[in-house]
Design a protein with these regions (language model features):
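Structured, helix-rich domain cores that form ligand/interaction pockets
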Residues: 1-178
Length: 178
């Protein structure tokens, strides 16, 4: 399902004020010309200006603080509605500038076992520069990048494991990222 997205709301409501959006979140920077600023919402970037409001970041990390679970469509809707409510603007009407998809697969063997076998994906060329990147394999074809990696190892490195329910996580979790 969806992972990282960039949403931009250009159809601003009547009475919109970018300062009120930033006052509802953790604002950390303002434009010198006084036309907008940046802030954080659940650790993800919000930009509010006179002409638009944008969100950029991982939806599951915004909702749960990690992305070791694949989001359902209902989870995505819940997250965007929560974003809209917290910012005070209808982000559910925003345009999607880009979206990255991810899905987690529970595996019976360590992900490195499968990573070695992926070089045979038809039509995709593995990137040589990804060698030694800690168990991540990238493939490119016609502007599409597919990434496979050991999600549990990555989450441990970044300290993004869920605070509750760690024991119920699968031992081997493989993530496909598109």
């Amino acid at each position: 399902m969806y992972d990282k997205v960039k949403l931009v709301l250009h159809a601003l409501p009547i009475g919109y004020n970018w300062q009120s959006v930033l006052s509802r979140i953790v604002a950390y920077s303002y434009r010198a010309d006084g036309t907008g600023g940046l802030g954080w919402w659940h650790g993800r970037t919000i930009i509010a200006t006179e002409t638009c409001v944008s969100f950029e970041g991982s939806l599951p990390k915004s909702l749960w603080g990690h992305n070791t679970h694949t989001m359902s469509l209902n989870d995505v809707e819940c997250c965007i509605m929560m974003l809209s409510e917290d910012l005070g603007v209808p982000m559910y009407d925003a345009e999607v500038e880009y979206v990255e998809f991810a899905h987690n697969f529970e595996m019976s063997q360590p992900p490195v076992f499968y990573l070695r076998k992926l070089s045979g994906i038809k039509g995709f060329t593995p990137n040589d520069w990804a060698e030694g990147k800690g168990g991540t394999v990238y493939f490119d074809k016609e502007g599409v990048r597919v990434k496979f990696y050991d999600k549990i190892s990555e989450a441990k490195k970044k300290k993004e494991l869920p605070k509750v329910g760690r024991s119920s996580l699968p031992e081997y979790l493989f993530q496909l990222y598109l």
